Structure formats: structure tokens, C-alpha cells
Amino acid sequence: MNPNGPYPGRQLFIGMTLNSSPAVAYLVTGRSPASRERKASPLDNGIIIGPIGNQPYDPLRHYTGVKYDNASGIIAVSNGIQTEAIFETYKLLFNTGSLPAIDFMEELLDGARAEPDSLHTPRIAGIATNGMNNQPVFILGLKRQEMPAKAFQVEPAPGTLTGISTYKGNLENPEPNDPDNLSKIEFKGKTAIELAEHLFEISKAVYNGDDIRVCAIGGIRSEDKHTWQVAMRNR
């Protein structure tokens, strides 16, 4: 079962595999047909959450969900327009030898603001980058409508990923999540597709007779410490 309940909305996790390789995962769910009519697709060094078939592009529902760089080993994941800004900011910090402080995550999420929908869906984001001595650094953040963004540096144990979701999990009455409401999943696999499948399978839920799962994405950094293996599972 999903640790955030049957309806997490959008959800992301960052952490490490059992052999201490950085890992990320991202889940998209939707109660309405429009929310479910999209899929994850690879594009250059990233994954987009886009339309199915010839449906028009909708900037609220369609976005870059994952962006990574196989030179620096950085990966960013989020539920909207903030993904590329977060990726480029932490890539710049890495390239200039600056520390990857959480302040940058908070400022970028504050700039993105909550989504302009009826629920004021929070913005969530995660980054896996490198700090001093090329050690991995993991940061999560959430921005709610009525409060400043809050970010955390996560120090996961091997085989554990820490995550955050947009909603608290109630399928009938979704509520924006709190930034302190972090959750964890255990992962014993070794590949990106195993991680994507694992998150997809534990998140099965039905609303008005329809499976709410849209897609799940998994990413694991190789032992060379900079190359990402990324895979996806669509409904």
C-alpha cells in the first residue's frame, strides 16, 4: 500500500538503493478522466508527463517531470513548471563549486507558487546532487498555497527512499499535504524499471470504478556516480 494513502496525487521519493546508489521515483495519479489521459515519455535527458495521442498540450497537466545530467550526476524531479529551473540551479551550483543549499529549493518553489487549480495543489520537488567530496546530497521541498515553501535535506539509509506527496491521501476528499508529512518506502531491487514498477504496484487504488494510476518513473544512478538509468511504467 502507498504510505501516503490511496490518493497521494503526485508523489516523489529520493534515497538510495541497497548498494548506496542514489535513486529517485515519481508517481502520477488522477481521479478525473482528464487527469488520467496522459503518459510519461522520454525526451532528451528527461521524462515529460504529456498528452496521449493528438490531445492538445495543457501547461497545467503536461510538464517535464524528470531532468538529469550524465556529466554531473544531478537529477531533478517535480510535479510541474519548476523542474527545469531547479535542475539548472543546482547544476550551476555544482559547476561553480558552490554548496547545494536548501534555500535555493525554497526560493524556486515560492516562485512557482501552488498550482492554479481548485485545490491549490502544492508544488513538490526533489533533487539528488553532489556536495563536498562528491558525496550525494538529497533535498525535498513542498510549497502550499497559504505558507512559504519548506525544503529538507534527507539522509536516507541504504534501501530506503523518503518522499512527499501533493495530497494527504483521502480519495473522497483530497487535502493539500503538509511539508512535514514525509513518508518512506523500502526498495530491494537494482534497476530503474524495478523501482518504477514497485511504486506503481503499491499505489493501486480505484475511484468511481477506474484505476487512478497514470504512470510511475524510476531513476537509479550507476556506480560510475554520474550516469542515470531511468525507466517508466504507464497505465
Question: Whereabouts are the PLM-identified features?
Answer:
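Conserved short alpha-helical segments that host acidic/polar catalytic motifs at enzyme active sites
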Residues: 1-235
